[in-house]
Amino acid sequence: VAKCSTSECGHACQQAGCRNSGCRYGSCICVGC
């Protein structure tokens, strides 16, 4: 399971063209894709 951190999620979401909406259960929540 990937470690959940705001910076990691923000980068992952940005790479996918999305915005970070936080994280839950170790997974990034991306919105606006």
UniProtKB/Swiss-Prot annotation:
Top-rank lineage group of the source organism: Eukaryota
Tissue specificity remark: Expressed by the venom gland.
Keywords associated with the record: Disulfide bond, Ion channel impairing toxin, Potassium channel impairing toxin, Secreted, Toxin, Voltage-gated potassium channel impairing toxin
Disulfide bonds: 4-23, 9-28, 13-30, 18-33
Keyword presence, Translocase: no
GO cellular component, one term: extracellular region
Swiss-Prot/TrEMBL domain comment: Has the structural arrangement of an alpha-helix connected to antiparallel beta-sheets by disulfide bonds (CS-alpha/beta).
Family membership noted in the UniProt record: Belongs to the short scorpion toxin superfamily. Potassium channel inhibitor family. Alpha-KTx 24 subfamily.
Entry function: Reversibly blocks voltage-gated potassium channels Kv1.2/KCNA2, Kv1.3/KCNA3 and, weakly, Shaker B.
Record-given protein name: Potassium channel toxin alpha-KTx 24.1
Organism: Pandinus imperator (Emperor scorpion)
